[in-house]
Amino acid sequence: MIRYKISFEIITAGEFWVETERGKSMPTTYTHYRFGKDVLEVLPRRIRAAMETNRELFDIGLHGPDILFYYYAPVPNAVSGQGFGMHRKMADPFFAKAAQVIAGAEDQAKKRAYIYGFICHFVLDSECHPYIEKMIQKSGISHSEIEMEFDRYLLSKDGKDPLTYKQTEHIAATEENAQVIAPFFENLTEKQVQKALKGMKLCHQALYAPGKRKRNLVFGAMKIVRQYDRFHGLVMSETANPQCEQYCLLLDKLYEGAISVAADLVMKYQNYLLRDCELPKRFHCTFGAGEEWEELVL
């Protein structure tokens, strides 16, 4: 019981920092992981090979800069701040620098696998977040709950139990993977990246509540610190929220449309890496909702 309470207090402080910095809560995990698998299936074999050979790195890349949120989540710091900041900035400078990192690497295939996963994350975020922001405005439902409900929707669609599915099993928080990833970010060491990846697994484990006992402990701790309304949406609910049914259907359409966008962008980025051509203009937007979300019609 004490272990669960301590774990929740860690999450709560970290989540508050996410809310104040980014205006969002911690991101979905299954949706991004599933999206990457779907993009892989439509890519040409010659491009897909690098990702499949280095699947752990591709899978981590699918979570983009979000992995940095989990670095000492309770305390504001430069590492987590870099992750938050990247969501507000245009993405093209990051991907231009990434090309330089790849060009200077001894094992370029590993670097490419990671960054191709990162591209998938960027595309799904930038396609869906404007609509999620509009959903929040219209319904008052939190960002975290909408994304949690979409995770539930996809897990159920895939025949998986949303309550028992462990969402970070594909995250390999190894020193070797951290060594590949660190150079893509500003002034981060491999130890910091590995700590962030381990933090990601720890945070998700703390909020994993397949049974009533753990669920009651987590929700009870939220109520004790008066944060239930803000954070209960981070825990997979026992039943679907009917208010999110239509939102999930819309997000599913956006998701399906984004698969071809991501595959096309991966191929164009590979051309950018290997040939003398311009960085695709699709990178000139943020990971977030952007400035025109209020004009959207749901």
Can you name each region flagged by the protein language model?
Residues 11-115, 123-298:
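N-terminal leader/auxiliary helical segments
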Residues 120:
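Aromatic-lined, polymer-binding surfaces characteristic
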